Swiss-Prot record:
Source organism of the structure: Arabidopsis thaliana (Mouse-ear cress)
Entry note about domains: The pumilio repeats mediate the association with RNA by packing together to form a right-handed superhelix that approximates a half donut. The number as well as the specific sequence of the repeats determine the specificity for target mRNAs.
Cellular component annotations (GO), alphabetically ordered: cytoplasm
GO terms of molecular function: RNA binding
Gene3D superfamilies: Leucine-rich Repeat Variant
Keywords, sorted A to Z: Cytoplasm, Repeat, RNA-binding, Translation regulation
Its job: Sequence-specific RNA-binding protein that regulates translation and mRNA stability by binding the 3'-UTR of target mRNAs.
Keyword RNA-binding attributed: yes
Name the UniProt record assigns to this protein: Pumilio homolog 18
Length: 327
């Protein structure tokens, strides 16, 4: 593809591009592995999109380009999947592609196709994932639907990835289609146990609980019943159980499990560096709305009050002391 075959409004881009690193238009910059189809224009455009010193030049070029020219630029950027990936996986490349999203449906169509071709790789990348997040905000309904379908298909892969879980959380938060939002919440809820035990997935469970969707919270609580105590011994698992205690319906599920375990296990949980926060929260929230459950916990914990004083459970012992003095 020759330069003459791709006229931009910025047709003099080669000559105008800043070249502080001494990279010529015919020599691809570091990070870009050219294919046989690569042209000097590909190399120059790569430099424009990824050079940390080219912010003002990029803004000026975009502001002076009409829709047709932006469409040609989008076509070139997405002409090869590896080339597109080499751009969006860089800090500045990701930011500048995000700036191009939403300019027109024709421009978005090129980017939508490019994202779909490498969806999982893009959405689990530290920088490229923000391109998907932005696309889900500005694309039209048809393109969003295509992306939603891909998100649902790969949702568990995203949830269990350190960068993908962040992208999935943002996508769920901003989801403007009730059907797909419910589908995503249901998928998280039905896989709550697996995700709660995953280093990244637990952040997704924590996040959806903060959305206070009653149906989702109920489903998560049901799917975690019988596992809440085990989760409470773990740092991030305890955060999930604490969130469940904040809503009465799911609180009952957790407290019933606490009351159903043997006293020795509850004592060990109350003395645990993470579990003690779960027990404290259970006491505080049951006291506000379910005194029957509250007194059940007090009676079950009281025989261990001396052991609790000499551990992470000292705060629980203080709560028990305050009620023993009142009685």
């Amino acid at each position: 593809m020759a330069v003459a075959d791709n006229p931009f409004s910025m047709s003099t881009m080669f000559n105008a591009l800043p070249n502080p690193k001494g990279i010529s238009g015919s020599i691809p910059p570091p990070g870009f592995a050219p294919r046989a189809s690569a042209t000097p224009l590909h190399a120059a455009l790569f430099n424009l999109m990824t050079d940390g010193d080219g912010v003002s030049y990029f803004k000026e070029m975009i502001s002076n380009s009409d829709k047709t020219e932006l469409q040609r630029m989008a076509s070139l950027l997405t002409s090869d999947s590896d080339y597109f990936m080499s751009i969006v996986t860089t800090k500045f490349g990701s930011r500048r592609v995000q700036k191009l999203l939403g300019k027109s449906d024709d421009v978005d169509a090129f980017f939508c196709a490019a994202i779909l071709r490498r969806f999982l790789h893009i959405t689990t990348d530290k920088y490229a994932s923000y391109v998907t997040i932005r696309a889900m905000v500005v694309f039209d309904k048809v393109m969003k639907k295509a992306l939603y379908e891909r998100i649902l298909y790969h949702a568990l892969d995203l949830a269990c990835d350190q960068h993908g879980c962040i992208a999935l959380n943002d996508i769920i938060t901003d989801a403007d289609d009730p059907y797909y939002r419910d589908q995503l919440l249901e998928l998280v809820a039905s896989n709550a146990l697996r995700l709660s035990n995953d280093a990244s997935g637990n952040f997704v469970v924590q996040h959806v609980l903060t959305l206070y969707d009653s149906r989702c919270i109920h489903n998560i609580a049901v799917n975690l019943y019988g596992q809440c105590i085990e989760l409470s011994f773990k740092k991030y698992g305890s955060y999930i159980v604490e969130k469940l205690l904040e809503v009465e319906e799911s609180m009952v599920v957790v407290v019933v499990e606490l009351l159903g375990c043997d006293g020795d296990r509850l004592m060990r949980l109350a003395r645990n560096e993470f579990g003690n926060f779960v027990v404290v929260k259970a006491l505080r929230f049951t006291k506000m709305s379910r005194m029957d459950l509250f007194w059940g916990l007090v009676q079950k914990l009281m025989p261990f009050i001396r052991l609790l004083r000499r551990s992470h459970g000292s705060n629980i012992a203080n709560i028990l002391d305050s009620f023993r003095l009142r009685c």
